[in-house]
Every structure is written in C-alpha cells, then in structure tokens.
C-alpha cells in the first residue's frame, strides 16, 4: 500500500488509517542446564552431530558457521586461550568468538589439524537424526539447531554474564536481538566462555 501511494497509484495512504497490529514474542525452546547434561550424556547415532550440537551450546555458533568452520580459524585469543576468528555466514561480518577449554577438548583441538572441524556433518542430520537423539535423551521440547544458540544466551544470562558480553560473544549487531534471546572487554568475554559446561559439578 505504501508503494502504491508513493507511486501515486492511489490517492490516500491507507496505512494511516489502519490500527497497528500488536505482536507477541513467541516463546522459543532452549535447553535447561539439566537437559544440557542429559544431552551430553546421551549417545547419538551420528557422533559428529552430537559434537557439533554441544559445541554450539558452548560457543553460540550457528549451524552455517559450524558447517564451514576450519581448524585454522581457531586462533590465540588476546585475553588468553583460544577463539574462533571467522566470517559469520549469515551477516558476512568478521567476528572473534572466544571458546572455552572444554569446547576445545570436545572437538579434539590440535594446532596441527587442517580442513573442516566438523568434516562429514550434513545439515540434513539436524532434522530426523537430531530429533531421535533428543528424544532418546528424554527431552520433549521442540529443539532445533538454533535452539542451541538460544541455550547459550539463556544459560549465560542465568549465570550472571553481562548482556553486552553475551551480545558480543554472539556477534549481534543490536542488543535488542540479544534481549530477544534471553564491544565488551576481552577479559569479560574470556571469562564468559567458561560459564557453560557439559560436566556436572
């Protein structure tokens, strides 16, 4: 309607007379701490899928970035430890995302490794194979791969991580995007990377 009015195909901007439709945020599923433990403890028929899913929970990486992640993109982090230095597939922006020692252990990191980190992983596995694994873990929520990113944001927030640190670690341009899920100094980002664990304490 706005385009029609702008092009003078109609005389009146109808939008001026329409009531704004109020939208509600649709609740999205994420894993609780206990559910994350269960998932980590449950075998998956596609081991590389399990590793990728848990890595996403620990780092907030999207499936597109998981699929394209190369070993050489894991580099030294200025505040200590390692980080992923990558071009985010969705936004095409350069990002630095710190990763915990546990996440490095999970993927079997070694500086000598080359090529894809999750070699052999198929996007299609995030459908039926992943749903079966989640069901076997006793989780009844509607979990998608993107739910792992939401899990990261929610559990970081619950652990007391500052929202701007979460925003930075998730490579969000706007803090409102981060708020719907649930630049900071490197030391805070590094500390935050260790706050989500797959091991019961």
Model-derived features: positions:
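Basic, Lys/Arg- and aromatic-enriched nucleic-acid-binding interface segment
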Residues: 6, 10-63, 67, 199
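Short, polar N-cap/turn motifs at the start of nucleic acid-interacting alpha helices
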Residues: 73-80, 140-142, 161-180, 191
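Active-site/catalytic core of tyrosine-dependent DNA strand-transfer enzymes
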Residues: 98-140
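C-terminal catalytic core of tyrosine-transesterase DNA break-rejoin enzymes
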Residues: 6, 54, 58, 65, ...
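N-terminal core-binding DNA-recognition domain of tyrosine site-specific recombinases/integrases
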Residues: 2, 9, 25, 47, ...
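DNA/chromatin major-groove-contacting recognition/catalytic segments
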Residues: 38, 95-98, 159, 183-201
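Catalytic-site neighborhood detector that most strongly recognizes the C-terminal catalytic loop/helix
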Residues: 30, 88-92, 170-195
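Conserved tyrosine-mediated DNA breakage-rejoining catalytic core shared by Y-recombinases
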Residues: 19-23, 29-35, 59, 68-107
